Amino acid sequence: MPTKNFRAFYRGLDDAVEGLYRDELLTLADDGKTPDFGFDSRIFERAAEWVRERGGVTPSMLQEPPARDVIDETFRILGGAVSSSISEEMPAELTGLLENNAFIFSGLKTYHSLNEVGLSLIGDDGGIKPFEKFHEDVAKIDAKYNRNYLYAEYNHAVTSSQMAAKWHDFQQDGDRYNLQYRTANDERVREEHQRLHNITLPVSDPFWEQFMPPNGWNCRCVVVQVRKGRYPESDSQQAVGIGEEITEEPKKRIFRFNPGKELKVFPDKHPYNKAPEAAKKIVAKLAEEIKTPEQAVRFIQEQEDRRAWFERGFKTLEVTRRKGVNGSTDMNGNIDMTRERLDRVLSGLTKLRQGGEVSFEEADALATFWHEITHNRNKPGNEYLTTLARRYMELANEFVARKTLPEFYESFGGKMQHPEFMDDRQSTGYNTWVRNYCSLIRKTGADPDKVLDAVRKHLFNEHYSQQAVGLVKAIKDSGATKADGTPLKVTEIKTLVKGCLLYGERMFDEYVNISLAEH
């Protein structure tokens, strides 16, 4: 059960939160009621019952399913507010930072709301509350946090994200334009915000570091670019003075920040952030988890070297509808995978992001993912292929993909894991073909590094219908010879490469040995 000092601290913190969200600070819907964002109250009720059974909340409990479900449900709404407010032109790394902040906010909000549930276990007389009374209080806490507060937080997330995106655009133009603060200019505008209306200053002015909208819950103010000289520039010190004056109260002062410059949706001084350091660390680690395909796409896009993996951009990662495949791609940045492999890709990417070790199954799924990424590096793009041409293409693609797996892992700041997949990946139907090709390289004495470089260059730059040519030429130009040292002819290598597709490994080895021994 919560201690007396703990209860006193959180009662005070709860009062601070309630003061921050008091009605006069919220501009509610026209009917005076906050809209329902579809938060699933059953999730909160299950978590509340779990808290009752555990006798309270500790930071470590945030990692357990009941609390995680509340965090995820909160983030579903607040994260959706962020993603729906930003255009596709916004760099993925910036979008990722904003969504990360919304997740952390969701986690700390959950910790605070569940702590209030824990406090409600004890009545004013110091005894355990009756079951019915406890659940009445839970319903009130749910309505307060997951409807009333959530309404203000959702609107704030929308405006903050929009202003962050605008700020990114403003930065591209520098001081070529001035920025002008504008209210909605109607009867609902707050008097203090009206005082900021039409303030016009360069983008580099310190005013924008503190008073970029939103400047309060449900603030509808915006900032727009205007041509220099069209409007008189405001006095910077006077503008800052007005901003400081209208946000002098502590509960208003928390909005003194620039979401675009700080790349945060919610201000650091929000009372939720007064959670224990242990809770903050756990939530920060949870925020690194990649739980959805959309998050995986953005994570891959965060770095320029990873964006270069896609000739036509990385757009979607989805569950495949095709049967009998591990994955597929249209080579236009859309990758499909089986549900099982996709889930393992997400968990594997999470571990790589956190510097952890991936499992054998995750490494296998990541190898499939890398195979499909490698397809997207082909410059000419998809085209109709005969069955034989497609087999040559898949041989070349899987050969390059598995031999360059270290590049994939190194892009996340780590070393190659499960290197066995560079030589043998039995989950793919192309495994025998590739192992035969690697055997051919060894038996002919061709330089494996030169072969890889040549096949890779041909795979990325030439039409898929011509990949047989690349596979043959790579071995020819890398010193391939017969057993007696006689250089192999192109026609001989063609026959041997075709054999990679026709025979099992043992039969292929015998076939190559016989072919290389012939004079």
Pin down the residues of each PLM region:
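Short secondary-structure subsegments characteristic of cysteine-rich extracellular domains
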Residues: 237-247, 420-441
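Non-catalytic terminal regions with compositionally biased, polar/charged low complexity
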Residues: 453-461
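Internal glycine-rich, Lys/Arg-flanked active-site/core loops of soluble domains
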Residues: 123, 131-175
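Post-HExxH zinc-binding segment in Zn-dependent metallohydrolases
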Residues: 387-433
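Hydrophobic (often cysteine-bearing) scaffold residues that line and stabilize catalytic clefts
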Residues: 150, 362, 366, 389, ...
